[in-house]
Amino acid sequence: MEHLLTRRQLLAGLPAGLLLMRGWAHGLEHGRAVLGYQLDLSVLFNFLTFSLTGTVVQEVDRRAGRYQVTMEGKGTAISTKTEATGIIRDGRFKPVESRSVHIFRGRQNTSTTTYDYEGQRIELHAVTHTLLLGRRRQVDGVLALPPGHHVDDLVSTELNFASNTLERDADGTYHTLVVRRARAEDEGPDDVSPDGYQVELVPLRFRPSPDVATGRLTALVDITRFSSWARSHQPARVTFAPDRRLESMQSSLILGTRLSVRVTGNA
């Protein structure tokens, strides 16, 4: 799925990555599963509301050492399709390519990211539009894969966490690197660079702990790594099922915006 997520792409894209749904315990080992999801978003204190319902098709072939995730969803004035493929090496999921097409309020947003492990580089090309004014953002960037460090997308991050192959510190904090559009920390929702954008690697860290009431693992995740509409002092709250699949997510964003995702089970 796309890694340079605007708020719109966060709406369309998260289900294929962080939201690889509980209920895929067997598919994670080997096989195919088709799952559903529901995503709701309100903007400007409910002045604008959007809902997206869709399916995620997940295929893992451990014998061949590869995986593929395809996500499609539709809602009022929005449709999305994302295909993410990767390889499995020494038990770890590693992204190879992600292609996304999102149509939102009549505007098409596209993104392609490739990970070249032989050439030791990441390449990303994207054309997106801001939500409120529809301003065009173009991203064309190449990065070197850092020696001795793993780089993930949202799909491989969730897969590695679920299979307990994501890197973990002694204090229980999981971490990896993800690629995003390089931007100023105080970027506004309709700010656009006339010179286009490069890309950068940023750390993604979260520390799950059991909820006192339910016993479910929960974590606060800084999604500024994926959306300029997020703020680091308002991390998203995610809840995981016993098999370490994401069960739900709630997030407060800027301009009175709220994002909620929930698992709807097998499609």
What are these regions (language model features)?
Residues E123-E187:
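A charged, solvent-exposed segment within the mature domains of Sec-exported extracytoplasmic proteins
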Residues E2-H3, Q9-H26:
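N-terminal export signals
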Residues M1, Q138, H150-V151, S209, ...:
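Intrinsically disordered, low-complexity peptide-like regions
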Residues H26-Y117, T165-A267:
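Acidic, serine/threonine-rich low-complexity disordered tracts
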Residues R7, A16, L20, K94, ...:
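A generic structural micro-environment signature
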